[in-house]
């Protein structure tokens, strides 16, 4: 393996949504360094942090339609039966909700938890309380996707947080989606909620660290046999 390939495989790519921010921090570092040289190195620290925040590593996603994969990097902050948000139009019956909280040090690229077709995408404005609080699911700005899967419709909700003020979603209604496929990003700390129908059982614990596109957070009763994975 060449040195170039070694370096390329070692460096984690930056998502394109982060390019303007990284460039802005770098230019600011040059300007500050021209004014006072030590400020250049301080600026470069922030530039590197920004690149780290917008990192977009490859993930190896289990390919099994009975498994539910974490849509985000972070900490499992809630596992409970709740009524899904009205805008998702998933009915009034309680569904299993698994929440993953992302702090500013987590990778913030969001991935599909299951394979299926996007039925609807619903944005709702709101406040910006701490995303780790339970009331954030109802009060905060959010963007919800409904995905038709083998086991029925599931909901995936991107929730803005205390610092996060920008939800990005590049998925479209009626598009097919693979498990682990990238569909969005939330800037600077936030939360993802997954709403699952009857038959789903959690496979994570409160406080457990989840990895987007890799960690199995739930499964349906028919899950069996060896699991095949693919890079995403």
Swiss-Prot record:
The record marks 189-190 as: Cleavage (non-hydrolytic). It is an enzyme of class 4 (lyase). Its EC number is 4.1.1.65. It is a peripheral membrane protein. Pfam families: PS_Dcarbxylase (PF02666). Binds 1 pyruvoyl group covalently per subunit. Is synthesized initially as an inactive proenzyme. Formation of the active enzyme involves a self-maturation process in which the active site pyruvoyl group is generated from an internal serine residue via an autocatalytic post-translational modification. Two non-identical subunits are generated from the proenzyme in this reaction, and the pyruvate is formed at the N-terminus of the alpha chain, which is derived from the carboxyl end of the proenzyme. One of its GO terms (molecular function) is phosphatidylserine decarboxylase activity. GO terms for cellular component: plasma membrane. The active site is at residue 190. One of its GO terms (biological process) is phosphatidylethanolamine biosynthetic process. Keywords: Cell membrane, Decarboxylase, Lipid biosynthesis, Lipid metabolism, Lyase, Membrane, Phospholipid biosynthesis, Phospholipid metabolism, Pyruvate, Zymogen. It is found in: Cell membrane. The modification Pyruvic acid (Ser) is found at residue 190. InterPro entries: PS_Dcarbxylase, PSD-A. Signal peptide: none annotated. Pathway: Phospholipid metabolism; phosphatidylethanolamine biosynthesis; phosphatidylethanolamine from CDP-diacylglycerol: step 2/2. Its cofactor is pyruvate. Belongs to the phosphatidylserine decarboxylase family. PSD-A subfamily. Heterodimer of a large membrane-associated beta subunit and a small pyruvoyl-containing alpha subunit. NCBIfam families: PRK05305.1-1 (NF003677), PRK05305.1-2 (NF003678), PRK05305.1-3 (NF003679), PRK05305.2-5 (NF003685). HAMAP family: PS_decarb_PSD_A (MF_00664). Catalyzes the formation of phosphatidylethanolamine (PtdEtn) from phosphatidylserine (PtdSer). This is Phosphatidylserine decarboxylase proenzyme. It comes from Rhizobium etli (strain CIAT 652). The lineage of its organism: Bacteria, Pseudomonadati, Pseudomonadota, Alphaproteobacteria, Hyphomicrobiales.
């Amino acid at each position: 393996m060449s040195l170039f390939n070694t370096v390329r495989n070692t460096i984690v790519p930056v998502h394109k949504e982060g390019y303007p921010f990284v460039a802005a921090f770098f230019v600011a570092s040059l300007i500050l360094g021209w004014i006072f040289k030590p400020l250049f190195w301080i600026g470069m620290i922030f530039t590197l942090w920004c690149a780290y925040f917008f990192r977009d590593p490859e993930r190896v996603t289990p390919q099994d339609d009975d498994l539910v994969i974490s849509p985000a990097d972070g900490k499992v902050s809630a596992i409970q039966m709740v009524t899904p948000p009205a805008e998702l139009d998933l009915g009034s019956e309680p569904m299993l909700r698994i929440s993953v909280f992302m702090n500013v040090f987590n990778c913030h690229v969001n991935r599909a938890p299951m394979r299926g077709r996007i039925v609807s995408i619903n944005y709702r404005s709101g406040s910006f309380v701490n995303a780790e609080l339970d009331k954030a699911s109802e009060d905060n700005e959010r963007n919800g996707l409904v995905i038709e899967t083998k086991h029925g419709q599931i909901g995936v909700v991107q929730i803005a947080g205390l610092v996060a003020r920008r939800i990005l979603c590049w998925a479209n209604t009626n598009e097919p989606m693979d498990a682990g496929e990238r569909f969005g990003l939330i800037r600077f700390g936030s939360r993802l909620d997954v709403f699952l129908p009857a038959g789903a059982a959690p496979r994570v614990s409160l406080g457990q660290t989840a990895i987007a596109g890799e960690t199995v957070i739930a499964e349906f009763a028919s899950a069996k046999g060896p699991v095949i994975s693919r890079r995403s």
